Amino acid sequence: MTKTVLLIGGDGFIGTHLKQKLTDQGHSVNVIDKKSNRDINNEYSFITDINFSHVVFLAAEANLRAVKQNPKEAIKTMTSGLMNSLINYPQAHFTYISSSMVYGNWDSDSVHEYSAKAPIDLYGQLKLAGEGIVRELHDHWTIIRPTAVYGSNDDPRRVMPFFIERARNNETLTVKGHSN
C-alpha cells in the first residue's frame, strides 16, 4: 500500500536517507525544511493541499554546539514548530524523532522505554518536552529515540565523523567523560 508521507526537517541527515528509502519503496514523499525555504515556525510554510497518511517530524538542531550558541532558535523549532506541525496534520500518523539524550547519562549497560529520563542539556530537555507535546496534542503517534546516528553524507562537525576522520588520519582521539 502506497503511503503519502511528509518529512518535516527532511533535508537533514536522517531525513535524506529516509526520503530515499521511502521513495525506493514506492511511497510519495514531500519535504518541508528551512534549507528549502519552508520554515515550520511560519504557519504559511505548511503543505495543506495533500492529505498525508504519515508525517515524520525530524526538525531539530542536531549540532549541540549550535543549540548552545542559539538556544532561542532551537527552542522555537523544537516546540512551536512541532506544535504547528501537529495542528496542521491531525489526520496523519505522526512519528516524532526524539533522541536517547532524553535519558541523560545512564549508569546501566542499556536503557529501555521506561528508563528514567534525566536530560543533561537543552537538546535532551527539548526532545523530552517534544515527546510530551506529541502525546498531548495528537491521537496517532510513534516516538523513536535513536542513539548517535552516523553514516554517509553526515555533517563533518558532528562527533562520529570527527572521530572517524581522526582515526583515518592516525591522529589521537581525545574522549572526555567520566572514568567509571
Task: Indicate where each model-derived feature is located.
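N-terminal Rossmann NAD(P)H-binding glycine-rich loop of SDR-like oxidoreductase domains
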Residues: 5-25
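Adenosine-cofactor binding site in Rossmann-like domains, unifying the SAM/SAH pocket
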Residues: 29-47
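NAD(P)-cofactor binding segment of oxidoreductase domains
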Residues: 55, 69-94
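Conserved NAD(P)H cofactor-binding loop of Rossmann-fold oxidoreductase domains
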Residues: 56-62, 98-100
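Short alpha-helical oligomerization interface
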Residues: 64-81, 111-119
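Conserved Rossmann-fold NAD(P)-dependent oxidoreductase catalytic core, especially the SDR/UDP-sugar
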Residues: 83-122
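Active-site helix of classical SDR
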Residues: 126
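NAD(P)-dependent short-chain dehydrogenase/reductase
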Residues: 132-180
